[in-house]
Amino acid sequence: MTYTVEVLVDDDLAVDAALVERAAQAVLTAEQVPAGCEVCIRITTDAELHRLNRDFRGVDAPTDVLSFADDGNSSQFVTAPNLPRYLGDIAISYDRVLVQAAEYGHSPARELAYLTVHGMLHLLGYDHERGPADEALMRAREEAVMTALGLPR
């Protein structure tokens, strides 16, 4: 299937944007999302994730990944029925990628792919914070996609 994944990388960050796109595409394919959907993923810094977390979630601390799903219910904009469905935006802290990769004992590439997969699943409605059953389901989907990418635990 064909999807549009836009990856924006802040200046001075040495990021494998192709890996981010591949991980996002793998989630969309695994979840059988209809072709033509679009998503934007920004790779940025702890400072920017801290600001976004504070401004949008009221949490005054940095975090590793944030997902902003487009619920399609905005009355401010008119959308044509033939336009691709916009799933939303994801922001990932590359600073957290490096720290967490070292903490968990795996490569920054695996951590970057994992946070991309995690954020994509949130865009699609998965939420590990709803309870143990939802957490188990989301973790299983994450592991399935990571295995398909050749990056299992």
UniProtKB/Swiss-Prot annotation:
Location within or outside the cell: Cytoplasm
Q: Which GO terms describe its molecular function?
A: metalloendopeptidase activity; RNA endonuclease activity; zinc ion binding
The protein's required cofactors: Zn(2+)
Q: Which GO terms describe its cellular component?
A: cytoplasm
Q: What is its EC class? A: hydrolase
Keywords of the record: Cytoplasm, Endonuclease, Hydrolase, Metal-binding, Nuclease, Ribosome biogenesis, rRNA processing, Zinc
The family database entries (InterPro entries) matched by this protein are listed as:
MetalPrtase_cat_dom_sf_prd (IPR023091), YbeY (IPR002036), YbeY_CS (IPR020549)
One of the GO BP terms on file: rRNA processing
Entry's cofactor comment? Binds 1 zinc ion.
List each coiled-coil range: none
**EC number(s) stated in the UniProt entry for this protein:** 3.1.-.-
Indicate yes or no for the key word Nuclease.
Answer: yes
Question: What Pfam families is this protein classified in?
Answer: YbeY
Keyword Ligase on entry = no
Described by its record, this protein's role is as follows: Single strand-specific metallo-endoribonuclease involved in late-stage 70S ribosome quality control and in maturation of the 3' terminus of the 16S rRNA.
Among NCBIfam families, the record links this protein to: rRNA maturation RNase YbeY
Name of the protein this chain belongs to: Endoribonuclease YbeY
Organism, by scientific name, is Chloroflexus aggregans (strain MD-66 / DSM 9485)
